[in-house]
Amino acid sequence: METDNKDTYTLFINACVKKGSRTKRLADCFLSKLDGPVVETRLHETSFPLADEAFLNRRDSLIAKGDFNNPLFYLARQFAQADEIVVAAPYWDLSFPAALKQYFEQINVTGITFRYTAEGTPVGLCRAKRLTYVMTCGGTFVPEDYGFGYVKTLAQSFYGISDVRLIKAVGLDIDDADTEAILRKAEDQIRDNY
């Protein structure tokens, strides 16, 4: 689905890499509750450009010229035009998969996803009013200010997305954990609360 237009859609940013991903399972449950088309961006299938000096100079030049229709900014336009955002990212090493960080670096474009005031304060330019972050974790040590906190801060402070929610299932790999029961409980909560 081409998204460089005014169509209404939910953008699903999929940072899950494993077949049978538990995070993707919960995201699919949540997505099934939404109306309208879903555009999926699979980060493990996305080739991000190397952010070397030549790339940054080219990017900065395009931004300075206001050439926001350049293909380099496709992901940023797609993000900015979405009516709702869903991010699925397993909890890895106190954060999320590296591809998600690359994605955010790619879409942080002054003039598309945000702008600065004269005082240097970012103001969001994104259409979405809600971002839902879906994650699972094998353990139980999951400080929300790590991976989710980073995404929440970007969404609220840069993109203008005020409603940022977290759906999670944790303790999935603890000895004697009933993984299926934990996932079913999370799915029931999604069905009941969203």
Say what each PLM segment does:
Residues 1-89, 94-109, 188-194:
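N-terminal beta1-alpha1-beta2 submodule of the flavodoxin-like/Rossmannoid cofactor-binding fold
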Residues 2-4, 142, 149-194:
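Glycine-rich phosphate/pyrophosphate-binding loop and the adjoining helix
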Residues 12, 87, 131-135, 166:
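Structural beta-sheet core signal
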Residues 17-18, 138-139, 171:
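Short, glycine/serine-rich, charged loops/turns that create anion-binding
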Residues 43, 136, 169-171:
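Active-site donor-binding loop signature of nucleotide-sugar glycosyltransferases
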Residues 80, 98, 126, 159-162:
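Structured loop/turn residues at beta-strand edges in well-structured enzyme cores
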Residues 109-119:
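Conserved nucleotide-sugar donor-interacting segment of glycosyltransferase catalytic cores
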Residues 117-159:
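Short, glycine-/small-residue-rich phosphate/pyrophosphate-handling segment
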